[in-house]
């Protein structure tokens, strides 16, 4: 090698002694090394002084793993050593030197540095180390191997413990771990795991039971005989426990491998929870003593087997990857012994949960891109984040666990095979981990005792449910039954019900029985077959304050004529008398009904104009002369006759005039004359405009709006023809339809095949269909309208399946 060197960063307070001093000896294949404090190896700096005469006696005598090639030791600032001078056999090395970074195949032959040499850089072209090496207080020799021999290394550590492994084969041997270094654990720890030798027999197992315990400050001894597992001797000259009864922080590393056969439900793993009571069955703080138990946290990482760079991993190879579980915590002597006893009991007890393998192949695919280290294995850096200081655990009280929410899922982070963190969802009952919420929900079906527990319970009865909305709906049924006076009563039969649903079912019975019953409004001529529609009509039309009040009964009326007619009930006045009998009535409509029902057979002859009946034909003819004399003004466009010219003019303008020049600015309604528009505008003043919630129709009169909704936007047709069963929304429409069955005059359209007995309907047909002056036409039937609102109403009534454009 041309130049090999190390950078020394701190003042030297430890040394290598190659003179065979006491405490360091070579016993066959066994090397005994005393280690006290941790040192680190750093980078190379420029050179000023070179130390020569370092010739290796036997290149294969000592091998230090994980070395760095082409490193030069330079710039040794030693006032007592001259350049190119021979030195003795003793070398003083500063604190932060780690032999894992010493140049490969370099040994120390003869090198002595005086005691007063401070932090320096020593360079050498060739160095050798004898078999007996003594280390000072601040040097850790991590991994020393003898090539070609099966050896055993025993490290006696006073202040910290570092695991060491003996390499039984040359460097080309498949190695899982060569060096584990834990540094600066006050806030976080970084573990560089390069692998641990794995026997071929252990590869066939589903998981590994080997584990490593790394103590950062505790004294201990790790022994390895090359054939059996590693052991750790915790005997030390220094008491590891502190004065306050606490012990240094402990990191426990559990290594296990994945099983290719466990791929259902996305792969599961049973890992002990991070709380101390779940890990060891010991409370956080013993109330009978001041001993503090370990404060532990769970971290997961993986260590991949050595794989060629050009070889892709398949499902079976991913399943064989090694996973690590790391527990970090503080420990004292008594608690450590108790934890060790519990751990041994768990290892012997078959019912205790063990580490189950994870089949990451089925869950995350064949992603084999990982970080490669110098030996070719995937190197995973483990970051441990501590939430609390090391000295504040005794002052903290154990936190109470929050009640888990069924809609929230706990997660755990596992470093996957590719070195990236993976989120898993643990089962709160058995501890298994799953890659998604869906697999966790499917797994929860295996716990029927958990599913049987309902989250929400009714306080009034034994009803339970898992859904909040179901409980809310159930509580609604108790609102009306809590008090007897709040029971719902049927307005037709007086029967009481506990909730609205039962009342609605009961009303359906009344609806079927009284399908033909008509409900008439007390204030107007409105009639309907459903009581609900009548109630809505009363609220929409007659809910205002009526100014004309009866002084006898307090009933209100909208017009004085209605009040005058009502007062005849209290006074007994009956001004209308039947001309055929002594019947008298307070209402003219009742008199007409009486004549039709009682005297229709006695007077079979009826006037076609006013529908009056007579006993013989002479009376009818005399009566017809009255109509002819009174209506001498004949309309030129139709058969309409008027008694005076003004009525005839009004008829022609309203029926036979197509233009509406006078339009309202508020509702866009058109009128023939300005006087009509003036009356219409006066109706808008001081009145609130009511907007139809189904279309753009607006009106100040709520009664008209209600009639509009019932006629245009209501599907119910309560009035049906007894002959053809055709339905109508209003009784007036039914009366017009009945004329088609009476053999009356039929109006035939000259432009199409349309015919009707209703003269007004025939005129509307001619104007809307066969007139070109209507700008708004229906897109489906080409019918014309004067205003857009009329077209929208037509579409809603006759083209419901299409809807508004």
Curated annotation (Swiss-Prot):
The keyword DNA-binding applies. Its main location: nucleus. It is found in: Nucleus. SUPFAM superfamilies: beta-beta-alpha zinc fingers. InterPro entries: C2H2-ZF_domain, Transcrp_activ_Zfx/Zfy-dom, Znf_C2H2_sf, Znf_C2H2_type. GO terms for cellular component: chromatin; chromosome; nucleolus; nucleoplasm. GO terms for molecular function: chromatin insulator sequence binding; DNA-binding transcription activator activity, RNA polymerase II-specific; RNA polymerase II cis-regulatory region sequence-specific DNA binding; zinc ion binding. It comes from the Eukaryota. Keywords: Activator, Disease variant, DNA-binding, Intellectual disability, Metal-binding, Nucleus, Phosphoprotein, Repeat, Transcription, Transcription regulation, Zinc, Zinc-finger. Signal peptide: none annotated. A zinc finger (C2H2-type) spans 425-447, 456-478, 488-510, 519-542, 548-570, 576-599, 605-627, 633-656, 662-684, 690-713, 719-741, 747-770, 776-798. GO terms for biological process: positive regulation of transcription by RNA polymerase II; regulation of transcription by RNA polymerase II. Changing residue 774 to C: In MRXS37; likely pathogenic; changed DNA-binding transcription activator activity, RNA polymerase II-specific. Probable transcriptional activator. It is linked to Intellectual developmental disorder, X-linked, syndromic 37: A syndromic neurodevelopmental disorder characterized by developmental delay, intellectual disability, behavioral abnormalities, hypotonia, congenital anomalies, and facial dysmorphism. Belongs to the krueppel C2H2-type zinc-finger protein family. ZFX/ZFY subfamily. This is Zinc finger X-chromosomal protein. It comes from Homo sapiens (Human). The gene is ZFX.
